[in-house]
Amino acid sequence: MSGGGNDFDDRVLGRATGVDAPPPPPSAELLRAVESTKPVRTRTRFGAAAVVALVGLVGPAIVLVHGPLRRDLAGLPAAWLIAAVALWGSAFALSLASAMIPRRGDVLPAPSRASMVAMAAMVVVALFALLATVDVPGQSMLPAERGWTLFESCVHCIGTVAKVAVVILIAGLIALRRLVPVGGSRVGMALGAAGGALGGLLLVFICPFASTAHVVLGHVVGMVLAAIAGALLMFRK
């Protein structure tokens, strides 16, 4: 009786004061379940980007090992070659990082930063191609030597860039699935620009054509088209 009376008193007091009776203690099963839980392993900031980069580098590495390399490679100025590798390589690394790695304290990549980095990378390599492309007289090849027009040589190199970029795009899209609810097209643009820059880096070593027109229309345009493809693939209404 006393137990029932206390329950009744608690209910009456709760209604009068607006304070309900205290909840019952947790069951033994609930306590055991809580004690057995383990912290969820969070995504690393660089792990996914590193995996995508490694997957994308496999193809170019195989091509460089088996060759052939451009016939004028030995005659190119060392400073120019270092600058070209640094610029195309930085465009690849920075674009990929902006698409895959959130800023410190964030959970998801920042679309605005990704698009800005990608556009800056494309502008820099375009200016380098326009203003600093070099050839080696007597060693650099002209499209006519293969029976090609300038347009045909550019289409060939755009195709090479596309083959490299598609690997980065597929690997990146898999890694980023369901992680970019908004701004996906801008992240996709950065991802495509990264793939295009990696293709351009490969062409530094294997493309025999060294005219400014070819490098701009074949290599840089290839990167731009890869960025557009990435934006379209990740476009979300």
Predicted regions and their residues:
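N-terminal acidic, proline/glycine-rich, low-complexity intrinsically disordered segments
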Residues: M1-F8
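Positively biased amphipathic helices and basic secretion/translocation or surface-docking motifs
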Residues: F8, V12-G56, L69, L233
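Polar, acidic low-complexity tracts enriched in Ser/Thr/Gln/Glu with frequent Gly/Pro and Thr-Pro motifs
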Residues: R45-K237
